[in-house]
């Protein structure tokens, strides 16, 4: 519930998800602009496009903000030959937090989640890496300001 989120928790989540992307892009911008070329890919989330499965307001809000930052940077950097896009993963068991979330669902909740995904499987880190590599490639040279949902068709 929103009443349970401390200001500190809110700020930590925004720092990790929005501030980090902003300051990394800011640091890379001069060299990319001088080169007239660059690729920036942010990792947002399905929670940046719709309500979060976690119910954590700060996480969903930060991921929505990251999508907005991605689109704004694409607008600003485009004239300099720099593309900016975002990969929005669905549920991937890739770290202790996602593993705890998965375990909290229990067998029935896990089954419901997998059945809500059109491909009937959870994503893998490789699924996310492949989408990211696409945005970094020349094949995506005329794509900017876009968010690619990598969620097995759940969105």
Q: Residue ranges of each PLM-predicted region?
A:
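Substrate-binding pocket helix/loop in short-chain dehydrogenase/reductase
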Residues: 1-2, 9-11, 102, 109, ...
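Active-site helix of classical SDR
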Residues: 25, 62, 70
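Alpha-helical segment proximal to the catalytic Tyr-Lys
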Residues: 30, 75-76, 141
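Residue(s) in the substrate-gating loop at a strand-loop-helix junction
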Residues: 45
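Short, flexible catalytic-loop segment of classical short-chain dehydrogenase/reductase
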Residues: 49, 88-100
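Short C-terminal tail/terminal secondary-structure segment
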Residues: 50, 133, 144-155
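Short, small/polar-rich loop/turn modules that mediate ligand/substrate recognition or access, typified
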Residues: 78, 83, 143-145
């Amino acid at each position: 519930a929103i009443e349970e989120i401390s200001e500190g928790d809110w700020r930590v989540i925004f720092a990790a998800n929005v501030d980090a992307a902003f300051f990394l892009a800011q640091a890379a911008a001069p060299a990319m602009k001088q080169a007239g070329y660059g690729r920036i890919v942010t990792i947002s989330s399905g929670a940046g496009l719709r309500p979060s499965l976690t119910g954590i307001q700060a996480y969903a809000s930060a991921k929505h903000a990251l999508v907005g930052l991605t689109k704004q940077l694409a607008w600003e950097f485009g004239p300099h030959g720099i593309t900016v896009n975002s990969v929005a993963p669905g549920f991937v068991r890739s770290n202790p937090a996602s593993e705890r979330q998965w375990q909290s669902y229990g067998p029935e909740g896990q089954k419901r989640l997998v059945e809500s995904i059109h491909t009937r499987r959870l994503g893998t880190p490789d699924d996310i890496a492949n989408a990211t590599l696409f945005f970094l490639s020349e094949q995506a040279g005329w794509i900017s300001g876009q968010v690619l949902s990598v969620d097995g068709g759940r969105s």
